[in-house]
Amino acid sequence: MQFYAIASLFLAGTAFAAPATSPNGYDACPDGGLIGTPQCCSLDLVGVLSGECSSPSKTPNSAKEFQEICAASGQKARCCFLSEVFTLGAFCQKPVGVTA
């Protein structure tokens, strides 16, 4: 029974999180549902687990702009999974074109 509850949360999170693509075609997180949600995160543990993540204030048009949007609030640009379900912890990776 617990499996169905966890599976439902997973599906709700991936369905709710539509990837944000800018008008010029920049897609920071092209992986789609799994690690496809652009987020600004303040904690980064071992480059995989991030915490205190939130959506960027606007859709970034480039990797540089994505970094600048997140840096304005002291956070790092990341592509995350489960960030809507677990706001204090998400599995993340660096977005396309982001080096730091």
Curated annotation (Swiss-Prot):
The keyword Secreted belongs to this UniProt entry's keyword annotation: yes
UniProt signal peptide: 1-17
Cellular compartments annotated: Secreted; Secreted, Cell wall
UniProt xrefs under InterPro entries: Cerato-ulmin_hydrophobin (IPR010636), Hydrophobin_sf (IPR036686)
Keywords noted in UniProt: Cell wall, Disulfide bond, Secreted, Signal
Disruption phenotype: Does not affect pathogenicity in a corn seedling infection assay nor the production of microconidia.
Disulfide bridge partners, by residue number: 29-79, 40-70, 41-53, 80-92
Family: Belongs to the cerato-ulmin hydrophobin family.
Protein name (database record): Class II hydrophobin 4
Organism listed in the record: Gibberella moniliformis
The organism's taxonomic lineage, starting at the top: Eukaryota, Fungi, Dikarya, Ascomycota, Pezizomycotina
